[in-house]
């Protein structure tokens, strides 16, 4: 059984990680352990590079916290121009996989508050009345009318980031 360390305690992110690992390696083949670690970037990262750095930093910190795992996984959400997205970083002892998620354009009324220094999650909670929305369906769920959720979009990016770990051509 693979020991997978999730560099987050966010249920939406953990669900995406578990589902993707089950699909790639077989249901029940992985044990997910969650750890809360720092990203080393602002709570609301801006731009692709800052967001990717946050995910890479979380993986590095998870490796320090749980050095005996088989995989370390981080999902860092950010704002790029007028959209929200995330970076997924997965490492094993010898490999790294990275993938960027789909992007969701955000309305100006939300972007104004985020650009003024507030994190997207609290702004969305204020807008929708849904407490801790970032740990649930997220802005993605709200603005797609539930057709997609934060977890479903993250799931796709985790599957993509896992590609080097189960395809021999990457080695």
UniProtKB/Swiss-Prot annotation:
Species, as recorded: Klebsiella pneumoniae subsp. pneumoniae (strain ATCC 700721 / MGH 78578)
Protein keywords: Hydrolase, Magnesium, Manganese, Metal-binding, Nucleotide metabolism, Nucleotide-binding
Reactions performed catalytically: XTP + H2O = XDP + phosphate + H(+); ITP + H2O = IDP + phosphate + H(+)
Known EC number: 3.6.1.73
Cofactor binding note: Binds 1 divalent metal cation per subunit; can use either Mg(2+) or Mn(2+).
Molecular function terms, GO-annotated: ITPase activity; metal ion binding; nucleotide binding; ribonucleoside triphosphate phosphatase activity
Quaternary assembly: Homodimer.
Chain positions recorded as substrate binding sites: 8-13
GO biological process, one term: nucleotide metabolic process
Keyword Aminoacyl-tRNA synthetase tagged: no
Residues that coordinate or bind Mg(2+): 38
Hydrolase is among the record's keywords: yes
Superkingdom of origin organism: Bacteria
Record-given protein name: Inosine/xanthosine triphosphatase
Functional description taken from the UniProt entry: Phosphatase that hydrolyzes non-canonical purine nucleotides such as XTP and ITP to their respective diphosphate derivatives. Probably excludes non-canonical purines from DNA/RNA precursor pool, thus preventing their incorporation into DNA/RNA and avoiding chromosomal lesions.
Cofactor(s) needed: Mg(2+); Mn(2+)
Family, as annotated: Belongs to the YjjX NTPase family.
């Amino acid at each position: 059984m693979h020991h997978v360390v999730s560099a987050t305690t966010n249920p939406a992110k953990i669900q995406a990680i578990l589902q993707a690992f089950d699909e790639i390696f077989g249901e029940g083949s992985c044990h997910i352990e969650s750890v809360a670690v720092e990203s080393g970037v602002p709570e609301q990262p801006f731009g692709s590079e800052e967001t990717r750095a946050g995910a890479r930093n979380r993986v590095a910190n998870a490796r320090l916290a749980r050095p005996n795992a088989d995989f370390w996984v981080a999902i860092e959400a950010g704002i790029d121009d007028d959209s929200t997205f995330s970076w997924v970083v997965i490492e094993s002892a010898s490999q790294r996989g990275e993938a960027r998620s789909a992007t969701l354009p955000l309305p100006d009324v939300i972007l104004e508050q985020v650009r003024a220094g507030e994190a997207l999650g609290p702004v969305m909670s204020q807008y929708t009345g849904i407490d801790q929305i970032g740990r649930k369906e997220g802005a993605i769920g709200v603005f797609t009318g539930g057709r997609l959720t934060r977890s479903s979009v993250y799931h796709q990016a985790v599957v993509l980031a896992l590609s080097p770990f189960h395809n021999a051509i990457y080695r």
